[in-house]
């Protein structure tokens, strides 16, 4: 890997191939800023070249949608008046089997091209963020819904209320787009009205006009300032920045969202009159995913029956591949790349099986026999005593919840020391006024609050995994003062179990719990500073300085362990003392001690103030043999070598300047790494694997509860769904920043007042690196839509976590799991679901399932498979191995 500078960089030429011969084919070259995985560069080059070509093609003036057309749309009440109108776009597909490198390819696209990277879901977006920020700092990655203007009140919108019939077969592009806009009309109309209302009725917003005028005034080249518009105007929509939109896991989106993204891109760019709009450029949608793995699901809630029905719909990838009109319009064979080979599990036989399922190839007896080796009785998988540490995958939330209840009952009986079962309360605040209005609109005057809450439990929370939890019975309390009904439920959790957060939650990182080796690794590669210190590196350095200062004593604590070699221990004490004296420039000669101490006091920075023990005189009236001071009691049992004099000569204070922050961090880092090297050399693996924990304040674990004075001094960050967490317990310690956010967001609803009087605990999580965090309460608002009326029905307060011990197959999409046990439902078996479940594993050695899906009666989407096989034979389609 190498990167060369821009035009002003020094011309340093590396030895290369001989000069090109006349008539030879010119070599394909990349710009200097490209960072590529050279093992797949040959396949990635044509992908980037084609996407760049599509993004630079100019439209005819008559093809560009005008701003007035969107104003006309906002004036409509029903979509029957929508005229036929083409919204030009281009598309590029990146598909392939599970773990083949599709998402990794996006990292190259992001570095080489200026594009807007998004995900179909929050998990997909955050997974992409992890990949992009792994090598470079990356701006946060949002969902495609966030980028085109989707809001919380759109979640419950009733789709497909206005029937639409295509005018011809095959339908024209304009007809297909009008059908999609009609289907999504409630959301489209609201987004359009909001955008134009914020616009204020002007011909165009002036952000880009002002920058263009400034370019002309200063004599700068075209685009010199307008390309920096997202920096000078931070609130600009992302669609104004680029016409290349990358959507990861696009197979999870319904087909109508293809037109929605194109429509919103044109509306936003017409509204701001961006340079790309003035240049007549069209949006290019780069759709990443696997059409045979994923499916688009849509849910409809029937209010009279209080029942949620879920149906499968055509997804974006299948829509582009199978629809003749779109296939020809996008020239799909010239805009399609297929990634082959599973890089998640590299076993040859297993990889062949994945290709058979991905591409719809014939299933032979050999394939069935290969899968037979993974089959075990279902009772073996569902018995919590078996397969400890394995992740169970089920077809439905109901099965997951049943297994979790069985697991918790098993742990309560066995009382295994590490895994302790405990419960935490979850609260739902229902507005009495809105509930009465709901009963009136749905003509259900006898509907009870308990029945409504039970029926809507999966809709009230902001994540579907809430249905997987082992919950108790709902208890309702009426609070007349706030006009609220508070529904309380108890959720069971397992201490020290693996969990995932289900939303972007704020967290306060307050300590570290791991080993000496893991903390040293954090300091060595600056991984913590890189991921947590994006807004201000100084905050991350201050936090790590506090942890290192509190953790230095653990090197001396390690030397107190029984069983260590006495000679090595004595040598360690001596070398640690020498290191401290060298770092703090201590003078050991008694003759010059006074002069040196005076000089040190004047020259030393405020953070290195020495403590003078000489002023401690004897107490009046005390016996001669009694210690004169509390410090004497502490130090009486220690000889001079066992005393960590670092704490006697260095006081941790708040640095006031950036230079002081870096100086403090550098000193403490040298002290920590120096001590680490000394003890590693003397004690090796015994020392490196020894437990190491340090916190910003004193911490006590009492069972599942964490007690601490205050997490003040911790570091504010965000808990991501892509991180791996261990549940370490809970705490009632208040975090000021969390309480302030609660008051700011939910003061009017009375929820903040109630939670301040009867606060919920915060959960304590440890991430995969060992950092301990207090995580904010997950609060979600539920807005019900009935016809054209929106009712702010409820606010839910819980912890926003789901267990990794068991999950649905759908939830596992995109994850890599070490050990997997799958329970399929025989009656309704889809082969693409079996493919998703089996492809999660990183090794077939750790894969079990209750039946062989290849031998059972199953559904298989052969239509999409035929198109994929045809594409594999098409010379215009790019194949990446």
UniProtKB/Swiss-Prot annotation:
Region span, Disordered: 1-26
Cellular component terms per the entry's GO annotation: host cell nucleus
Subcellular location: Host nucleus
Annotated positions binding ATP: 96-103
Keyword annotations from UniProtKB, A to Z: ATP-binding, DNA replication, Helicase, Host nucleus, Hydrolase, Nucleotide-binding
Subunit structure, as described in the record: Associates with the primase and the primase-associated factor to form the helicase-primase complex.
Biological process, per Gene Ontology: DNA replication
Listed EC numbers: 3.6.4.-
Family to which this protein belongs: Belongs to the herpesviridae helicase family.
Listed InterPro entries: DNA_helicase_dom, HSV_HELI, P-loop_NTPase
Gene Ontology molecular function, alphabetical: ATP binding; helicase activity; hydrolase activity
Function: Component of the helicase/primase complex. Unwinds the DNA at the replication forks and generates single-stranded DNA for both leading and lagging strand synthesis. The primase synthesizes short RNA primers on the lagging strand that the polymerase elongates using dNTPs. Possesses helicase-like motifs and therefore may act as the helicase subunit of the complex.
Name the record gives this protein: DNA replication helicase
